[in-house]
């Protein structure tokens, strides 16, 4: 995700919903400044248990991400089990929860 990403704003309440339902969401801020990340989180909420920085898009490229926002379900071994391209919408929440359950 990124503070400059408009679809990231749209998905923010749905990520909060996932968090409320028990999802552990780890964010990776793509090409972003810490002060902009802090402002975004203050305005739109913070569903993340942790946030990493990817100033050069190295993580993004390594996992095969095509852009922001993008959501991955990663199992306990670090294997990507599901990839959702684009912003998370209300209709995607049950799908993501099911994929999280399968990845356990």
Language model: regions and residue ranges:
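Short "lid" loop at the C-terminus of a central beta-strand within the Rossmann-like core
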Residues: 14, 30-32, 86
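Short amphipathic alpha-helical segments and helix-helix/interface helices
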Residues: 15-16, 38-41, 97
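Extracytoplasmic/periplasmic copper-protein system
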Residues: 104
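Short alpha-helical
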Residues: 6, 32-36, 58, 88-91
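Conserved redox-active cysteine motifs that mediate thiol-disulfide chemistry
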Residues: 1-17
């Amino acid at each position: 995700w990124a503070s400059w990403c408009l679809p990231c704003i749209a998905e923010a309440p749905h990520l909060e919903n996932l968090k409320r339902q028990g999802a552990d969401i780890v964010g990776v801020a793509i090409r972003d400044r810490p002060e902009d990340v802090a402002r975004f989180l203050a305005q739109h909420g913070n569903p993340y248990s942790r946030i990493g920085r990817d100033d050069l898009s190295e993580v993004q490229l390594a996992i095969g991400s095509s852009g922001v926002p993008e959501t991955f379900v990663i199992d306990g071994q670090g294997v990507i089990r599901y990839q959702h391209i684009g912003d998370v919408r209300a209709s995607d929440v049950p799908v993501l929860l099911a994929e999280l359950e399968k990845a356990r």
